[in-house]
Swiss-Prot record:
Gene designation: Amy-d
Protein name: Alpha-amylase B
Species the sequence originates in: Drosophila yakuba (Fruit fly)
Signal sequence extent: 1-18
PTM-bearing positions, type Pyrrolidone carboxylic acid: 19
Alphabetical UniProt keywords: Calcium, Carbohydrate metabolism, Chloride, Disulfide bond, Glycosidase, Hydrolase, Metal-binding, Pyrrolidone carboxylic acid, Signal
Annotated positions binding chloride: 202, 304, 343
Cofactor binding remark: Binds 1 Ca(2+) ion per subunit.
Entry GO MF terms: alpha-amylase activity; metal ion binding
Top-rank EC class of the record's enzyme: hydrolase
Subunit-structure text: Monomer.
């Protein structure tokens, strides 16, 4: 028995270690969540923008059939009707083509998968034509029957782990992942996505499922499809949605042995800092000292589709596209700092927190409109197309694994640091100018500041920085400038 247990433990360990690898193509980093985009539009974006600008991955909205809800809110996609690949974003053929096209240009696909639950009452028909009866827990499109669900009960006490994991989240019919038939169906669904070439999954509502059940499901998944450029034996990267701000019965540490987690404390803390509630000087020990999970277990972000709307965690401290100067600074810091696996949010604009994506007719999702300066219109925000963000993805790629060096701060809200001898950033969140001679760590030369502009041939469309033979440079960041950050790196040398 002891031997059998040891073998099981070793097997889980092997599974776990593989599941922390993002499976990114070499020389790339950073993923973007193209929230509610259509598959055909994502494929084109991989080819036209994400690939050429060094992005490593794209997180996509749920790919499986969901309940059609009145006024088509964004959250209808988190109400599954079946595992057929038919949504407002497109069908299976379009999704498969998207994954293939993105992989071909070095951009990996990560699917937001929902298998904690099925649709709540009122979700009687789906985007793929299936019908269901959530009130009787009948979902013939899978098929699931009442035998596959936990008994109906509500979650109202987050200090009771049994209730959080066995009862229904806001009325969503709660699947029993300990049931072998449910496990079979979930594995079948995820394996099908692996066959199509995806690199990993964001597991929605992982906190509401038992870690032991998830370990079984993850452990049964097939290895990634080598036809799509993955190394033989590669496992899907798994990032689990576990909101753990402390003080509840369930901790992210119960899940970090199985895969990475969505580190909501990062979002909350970075928001407080760049909103001026904490000083930038305190960022000197950014990382686990702030209560975050280990770096390779942390998917980090400034905001996500939930908390930008006040759902999830972080409340009013969360930064969004609606406060662009601070948002760009926080995003630049996240991308400049080596901690965690960063994910950039790409939103549609909203005034109502239930509002769905832009449509052509109230139902069919509209494609983003691209402007000459790379930005989007037509109701899409496209933060990933803001120069201050996509140029920092290139910065992250340029500095690689080089460590933070040459930390400087003014004892308040002005900081700077280098990433070895390959990149340098400075931030000013004070209400007075930053004007100092700082050690950049970089070789002598003239560099293009990739925040105010971009390198174009041998010139720069923004500010330039002259680094002396001693590595020092005069750094000026006016408090009233559009951007409170400056960044230079070896690939932006003129």
């Amino acid at each position: 028995m002891f031997l059998a247990k040891s073998i099981v433990c070793l097997a889980l360990l092997a599974v776990a270690n593989a599941q922390f690898d993002t499976n990114y193509a070499s020389g790339r980093s950073g993923m973007v969540h193209l929230f509610e985009w259509k598959w055909d539009d994502i494929a084109a974006e991989c080819e036209n923008f994400l690939g050429p600008n060094g992005f490593a991955g794209v997180q996509v909205s749920p790919v499986n059939e969901n309940a059609v809800k009145d006024s088509r809110p964004w959250w209808e996609r988190y109400q599954p009707i079946s595992y057929k690949l038919e949504t407002r974003s497109g069908n299976e053929q379009q999704f498969a083509s998207m994954v293939k096209r993105c992989n071909a240009v070095g951009v990996r696909t990560y699917v937001d998968v929902v298998f904690n639950h099925m649709a709540a009452d009122g979700g009687t028909y789906g985007t793929g034509g299936s019908t269901a009866s959530p009130s009787t827990k009948s979902f013939p499109g899978v098929p699931y029957s009442s035998l596959d669900f936990n008994p109906t009960c509500s979650i109202n006490n987050y200090n009771d782990a049994n209730q959080v994991r066995n009862c229904e989240l806001v009325g969503l019919r709660d699947l029993n992942q300990g049931n072998s038939y449910v496990q079979d169906k979930v594995v079948e669904f995820l394996d099908h996505l692996i066959d199509l070439g995806v690199a990993g999954f964001r597991v929605d509502a992982a906190k509401h499922m038992w870690p032991a059940d998830l370990a079984v499901i993850y452990g049964r998944l097939k290895t990634l499809n080598t036809d799509h450029g993955f190394n033989s034996g590669s496992k899907a990267y798994i990032v689990q949605e576990v909101i753990d701000m402390g003080g509840e019965a369930i901790s992210k540490s119960e899940y970090t042995g199985l895969g990475a987690v969505t580190e909501f404390r990062h979002s909350d803390s970075i928001g407080k800092v760049f909103r001026g509630k904490d000083q930038l000087q305190y960022l000197t020990n950014w990382g686990t000292a702030w209560g975050f999970a280990a770096s390779d277990r942390s998917l980090v972000f400034v905001d996500n589709h939930d908390n930008q709307r006040g759902h999830g965690a972080g409340g009013a401290d969360v930064l969004t596209y609606k406060v662009p100067k601070q948002y760009k600074m926080a995003s630049a810091f996240m991308l400049a700092h080596p901690f965690g696996t960063p994910r950039v949010m790409s939103s549609f604009s909203f005034s109502d927190t239930d509002q769905g994506p832009p449509t052509t007719d109230g139902h069919n999702i509209a494609s983003p409109v691209f402007n000459s300066d790379n930005s989007c219109s037509g109701g899409w925000v496209c933060e990933h197309r803001w120069r201050q963000i996509y140029n920092m993805v290139a910065f992250r790629n340029a500095v690689g694994s080089d460590a933070i060096q040459n930390w400087w701060d003014n004892g308040s809200n002005q900081i700077a640091f280098s990433r070895g001898s390959r990149g340098f950033v400075a931030f000013n969140n004070d209400n007075y100018d930053l004007n100092s001679s700082l050690q950049t760590g970089l070789p002598a030369g003239t560099y293009c500041d990739v925040i105010s502009g971009s390198k174009s041939g041998s010139s720069c469309t923004g500010k330039t920085v002259s680094v002396g033979s001693d590595g020092r440079a005069s750094i000026y960041l006016g408090s009233s400038e559009d951007d409170g950050v400056l960044a230079i790196h070896v690939n932006a040398k003129l």
